[in-house]
Amino acid sequence: KSRMNPQTQYGADVIMRADHALEHGVEQLTGCIRNVVDEMLQELAEEAGRSTLDICQVSVVGNTCMHHLFLGISPASLVHAPYNPAISQGLTLNAEQYGLHIHRKGQLLMLPDIAGYVGADTCGCILALRQDQQNEISLMVDIGTNGEMVLGNKTRLACCSTAAGPAFEGAKIECGMRGGAGAVDHVVYKDGKWEYTTIGNKAPAGLCGSGLIDLVAQLYLAGFIDESGHLESGQEKAGVFVLVPPEKSGNDRGVYLTQKDIGEVQLAKAAIAAGIFLLMKRLEITEKDIKRVYLAGAFGNYMNPESAAAIGMFPAELLPRIQPVGNAAGEGARIALLNEEERKEMDRTVKNMDFVELAASPEFQDCFVDGLCFP
């Protein structure tokens, strides 16, 4: 079961919500997220023919800011250097005190946060994918406004968070939108013709993240975009590529891509590429040592890995090893709910993880700039 995050009314991303909390207090943000979780618990109980009073434990994961706001903790420590979470261990709490109307002795279970922008949701991914128990080295990437990554195996794990920006979630893109009905989700240039699909087979209304990456990749591979990201002339309007004209769209503007949109994609993919490179450097390994690449989250499930590799988001050598894993954070929360020993083990794993602070890395800027160009 899912709902749109009600906190979006206070800010489009976690940074804006954190700023709102610092200026106006956490009460509004805390109240609305607790209420929606409690409402969904009631809906799930009704669908199962049970009472919420039968629920004895609830496991919750989320990014560090969401984690703090759910608990009613100020996110002040997350927006000021050194960007450390206020709490970094797993918690077992009284659920009723946090607005969840379950069994009167019901427990709220929270996996630990790792760093300021690597949260309990990343712990859930590690737990679901068993990265900390594998002999082979794997890379997990959860692409969103912050691109969280974990690289390693049972011997050593390193993680980081890159400010990928909201482009892949449809923000800051002229015709961008979330992955809803009418969003162009896949694009192919074939035999001189543009083909695309939309979510729900509705009239095209905009570009969601997967469609955006496909479109940029296809434009680059077909020679409409050069290595620097410059959109070649030839369109009716300079610096604009029209995929769907207004008369064929579900709106009066059509679906198109601007030069600025391409720049936003370059910024996002360069941040992810730089994060991967610096994690490999920290562990002193190369692409050939990475045996699996897990793409977590809803976006990773729908993104075409070939398009991501084509624009340089991932090293091309990793393409055959890429595996979408869907809602790994949610699966990790389920495992944590059912296994106390796994929760304890995750606390130990987090304490031993190597967090790479990209903002403090003298090499990050060079890697980032190198990653702006298309390969």
Protein language model features and the residues they cover:
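Glycine-rich phosphate-binding loop of actin/hexokinase-like ATP-binding domains
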Residues: 1-13, 76-90, 124-211, 304-326
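N-terminal glycine/serine-rich phosphate-binding loop of ATP-dependent small-molecule kinases
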Residues: 1-71, 77-79, 109
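Phosphate/ATP-binding catalytic cores across multiple sugar-kinase/actin-like superfamilies
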Residues: 36-48, 122-125, 129, 266-288
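Short glycine-rich phosphate-binding loop at a beta-alpha junction
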Residues: 50-63, 216, 288-297
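Short glycine/threonine-rich loop-to-helix capping motif typified by GTGT followed
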Residues: 63-77, 285-288, 297-316, 358-367
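Acidic, glycine/GT-rich loop-and beta-edge segments that sit at the periphery of enzyme/chaperone cores
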Residues: 107-122, 335-375
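Catalytic phosphate/nucleotide-handling subdomain of diverse soluble enzymes
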Residues: 153-155, 285-349
